[in-house]
Amino acid sequence: MHYSLKSTTFAVIKWKYMITKLKLHNWKSFEDSTLYIDPLTFLIGTNASGKSNVLDAFEFLRLRLNGVTLDNAINQIRGGEDWIIQKGKHNARLEVSVEENGKEYCLKYEIFHDSNGFHEISPTLQLMEKDDYDSDTAFKVVSNNINDIFILDPIPNRMRNYSKVSKHLLKDGSNIAGVIAGLKEEEKKDLEEKLTKYISPLPERDINRMEAVTVGLTNTDAMLYCYEDWNPDVPVDARGMSDGTLRFAAIVVAMLTAKPHSLLIIEEVDNGLHPSRAKELVKVLKEISHDRNIDVLCTTHNPVLINELGNDMIPFVSYVSRDDMGNSNIQLLEDKDNLAKLMASGTVGDLMIMDRI
């Protein structure tokens, strides 16, 4: 069973087209599983459960639809050609469903391996309802949606350096200052105000302003600065900011600059953040994803963050686990057998700690 937020007033039906689910068949550690995508989705599970393999599927499809050759795309995925197809199998298939104005399209993409190497079967597209449709237009809708996927995995050490003024945020967040500085003046001011608003409750320091400033004669490089309540006239550059502050700044900027109707994927969303700030993080994720009409998929294995989601988010949480054969499986949390009975003895996070999910 799956109840989508896209059919509720939460989303106010503002979307044009959005990814609704991903099916994985013989993909890496998965034999046959489905992940449902909502405006805000959490994918939980322990380390090595297979969460990253789900994200690799999105990245692989994005690479291929952006023109990267099959062999190069495979080698850019974690594990490369040795792990992209489940052990003992010869083919892998990915299916992405995209909903556009009430119509659902499904793109099927399959690769196989033989003695001559890897090959692919031409992607097929079908309309899930019986209706006439323009296949070229439909393929463009689906491929554009996949192309717009952005996977964020901030690396604070790379965010502390000067960065070139840029239009698009990099996966590791290293050019965050350059992206902010590259905006038009009014857009830059608005983003910096929102960034300050969202980040001020989170870090250990009392931040009252955050901004990106260009440097040098040509103004082609930028640095991220913050100002603190106890020393408001002395800026602190990114080199003096904590890992948690930088990671959270990257998350906020990614959400504020993401293309409307696109899917933003954030790996280990709470990594480096103090557990006491989990509630604020969840609040920010809900607010920005709703206001900007983007879908956000977060992975986490932190019981504290999972507890902060609250029971109303249970329908939008999926968990990844391994079976006795080592296969990864995705299951909706709400479909867990005896979930209500299990939760009588503790929260979802507590159940994870006790290895009961």
Task: Please identify what each model-predicted range represents.
Residues 3, 13, 56-114:
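Conserved P-loop NTP-binding catalytic core
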Residues 8-18, 280-357:
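C-terminal lobe/lid and adjacent interdomain/linker elements of RecA-like ASCE P-loop ATPase modules
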Residues 13-30:
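N-terminal pre-Walker A segment at the start of P-loop NTPase domains
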Residues 33-38, 258:
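Phosphate-binding P-loop
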Residues 38-77, 175, 243, 248-254, ...:
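Phosphate-binding glycine-rich loops of NTP-binding sites
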Residues 40-42, 261-263, 295:
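Residue-level preference for the first positions of well-ordered beta-strands
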Residues 93, 99-212:
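Electropositive, glycine-dotted interaction segments
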Residues 204, 208-256, 263-276:
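Conserved ABC ATPase signature
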